């Protein structure tokens, strides 16, 4: 056994370093905070985003956009999703039961993403021009 080969026992843990507890520890007196200044004082930190009195970036940039309040009540369904539904008559209730739109949805619109190869009847749903054309090309129809 030699001094340079000493190891702590298995499962041993180092004690947490205690600052400000004497010069011999290497972290006494100023406790690693340096001399004077805001950061050396207790409670000496500014809030996040504070830039020393300069107008903060968040306030320098213009506001933009808004959050739509109707977003959660309007659903969007792809043609490819309608292809997978087991029913031929599609309305809002069928979409809710299939989990394609949320329970709070009051209206839905079909968009032309994906392919539709079978005949379906759409009741009470909106559709984009492309989606309407694709449904009618597959032999489907719209009933209001």
Curated annotation (Swiss-Prot):
PROSITE patterns: RIBOSOMAL_L15. Residues 21-31 have a biased composition (Gly residues). GO terms for biological process: translation. Pfam families: Ribosomal_L27A. Residues 1-56 are annotated as: Disordered. The keyword Signal does not apply. GO terms for molecular function: rRNA binding; structural constituent of ribosome. Keywords: Ribonucleoprotein, Ribosomal protein, RNA-binding, rRNA-binding. SUPFAM superfamilies: Ribosomal proteins L15p and L18e. InterPro entries: Ribosomal_uL15, Ribosomal_uL15/eL18, Ribosomal_uL15/eL18_sf, Ribosomal_uL15_bac-type, Ribosomal_uL15_CS. One of its GO terms (cellular component) is cytosolic large ribosomal subunit. The keyword Ribonucleoprotein applies. NCBIfam families: rplO_bact. Binds to the 23S rRNA. Part of the 50S ribosomal subunit. Belongs to the universal ribosomal protein uL15 family. This is Large ribosomal subunit protein uL15. It comes from Burkholderia vietnamiensis (strain G4 / LMG 22486). The lineage of its organism: Bacteria, Pseudomonadati, Pseudomonadota, Betaproteobacteria, Burkholderiales. The gene is rplO.
């Amino acid at each position: 056994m030699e001094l340079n080969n000493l190891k702590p026992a298995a499962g041993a843990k180092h004690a947490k370093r205690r600052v400000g507890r004497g010069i011999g520890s290497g972290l006494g007196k100023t406790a690693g905070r340096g001399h004077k200044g805001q950061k050396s004082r207790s409670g000496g930190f500014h809030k996040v985003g504070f830039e020393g009195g300069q107008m903060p970036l968040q306030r320098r940039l213009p506001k933009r956009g808004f959050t739509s309040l109707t977003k959660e009540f309007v659903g969007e369904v792809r043609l490819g999703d309608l292809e997978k539904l087991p029913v031929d008559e599609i309305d809002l209730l069928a979409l809710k039961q299939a989990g394609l739109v949320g329970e709070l949805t009051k209206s839905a619109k079909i968009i032309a993403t994906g392919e539709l190869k079978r005949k379906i009847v759409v009741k009470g749903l909106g559709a984009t021009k492309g989606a309407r054309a694709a449904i009618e090309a597959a032999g489907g129809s719209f009933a209001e």
